[in-house]
């Protein structure tokens, strides 16, 4: 089997293809590397100006080495093999959007550090209980969540109460699974 691509190799290919220097770029796309990336290694720390980083569609198992990315606002890690959210604390003060659908995440431990997070796309993971989902309530700015395809969502959608139960736990939500959240008071207020 082919050896995994390193971040350093992927960055060199990206620089060659785009004609940009990785250390100066605001947006860096390292998705779908062949062979795939398996580790977020220390070479990521060279991306000192990066605001949007895409590492989706690889074989990454752990979030790591984000400490040099002082301006990171959007992190795309969808379609990997990530099992938990450890490693995000390094970008807790700047990250506004986390795209982490199609991974193996069961627990949301560590999400509380993401104080600026507004958008969380984490469909098709393994979250199965409300205790985990409720941890999202610790994020003051979170307004848009995609959670479809998690066992918790599937169970409650089948029971017909997903939106209602989710919004009860996260009253600040504006959008859930792509649908605008309409609060009870707003509906009643429209009738007057």
UniProtKB/Swiss-Prot annotation:
Source organism per UniProt: Xenopus laevis (African clawed frog)
Molecular function GO labels: alpha-tubulin binding; dynein heavy chain binding
Record's miscellaneous remark: Outer (ODAs) and inner (IDAs) dynein arms contain the molecular motors that generate the force to move cilia by ATP-dependent reactions. There are two mechanosensory systems that monitor and respond to the mechanical state (curvature) of the axoneme. One system involves the central pair microtubule complex and radial spokes and the second system involves the outer dynein arms.
Protein name (record): Dynein axonemal light chain 1
Family matches, as PROSITE patterns: LRR
PANTHER family xrefs: DYNEIN AXONEMAL LIGHT CHAIN 1 (PTHR15454:SF73), NISCHARIN RELATED (PTHR15454)
Taxonomy, superkingdom: Eukaryota
Keyword list, A-Z: Cell projection, Cytoplasm, Cytoskeleton, Dynein, Leucine-rich repeat, Microtubule, Motor protein, Repeat
Main location: cytoplasm
LRR repeat windows: 49-70, 71-92, 94-115, 116-137
Compartments where found: Cytoplasm, Cytoskeleton, Cilium axoneme
Domain LRRCT: 150-192
Task of the protein: Part of the multisubunit axonemal ATPase complexes that generate the force for cilia motility and govern beat frequency. Component of the outer arm dynein (ODA). May be involved in a mechanosensory feedback mechanism controlling ODA activity based on external conformational cues by tethering the outer arm dynein heavy chain (DNAH5) to the microtubule within the axoneme.
Record family assignment: Belongs to the dynein light chain LC1-type family.
InterPro entries associated with the record: Leu-rich_rpt, Leu-rich_rpt_4, LRR_dom_sf
A GO biological-process term: outer dynein arm assembly
GO cellular component: cell projection; cytoplasm; dynein complex; microtubule
Quaternary structure note: Interacts with DNAH5, a outer arm dynein heavy chain. Interacts with tubulin located within the A-tubule of the outer doublets in a ATP-independent manner.
Gene: dnal1
Keyword Metal-binding in record: no
């Amino acid at each position: 089997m082919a050896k995994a691509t390193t971040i350093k190799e992927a960055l060199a290919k990206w620089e060659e293809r785009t004609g940009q220097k990785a250390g100066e770029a605001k947006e860096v796309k390292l998705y779908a590397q062949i062979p795939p990336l398996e580790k977020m290694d220390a070479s990521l720390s060279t991306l000192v100006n990066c605001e949007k980083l895409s590492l989706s569609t690889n074989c990454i198992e752990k979030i790591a080495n984000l400490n040099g990315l002082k301006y990171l606002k959007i992190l795309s890690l969808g379609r990997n093999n990530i099992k938990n959210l450890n490693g995000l604390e390094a970008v807790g003060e700047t990250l506004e959007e986390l795209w982490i659908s199609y991974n193996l995440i069961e627990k949301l431990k560590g999400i509380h550090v993401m104080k600026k997070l507004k958008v969380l796309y984490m469909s098709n993971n393994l979250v199965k209980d409300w205790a985990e989902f409720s941890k999202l309530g610790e994020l003051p700015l979170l307004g848009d969540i995609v959670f479809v395809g998690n066992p918790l969502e599937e169970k409650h959608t089948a029971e017909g109460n997903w939106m209602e139960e989710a919004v009860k736990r996260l009253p600040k939500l504006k959008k859930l699974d792509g649908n605008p959240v309409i609060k009870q008071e707003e509906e009643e207020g429209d009738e007057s």
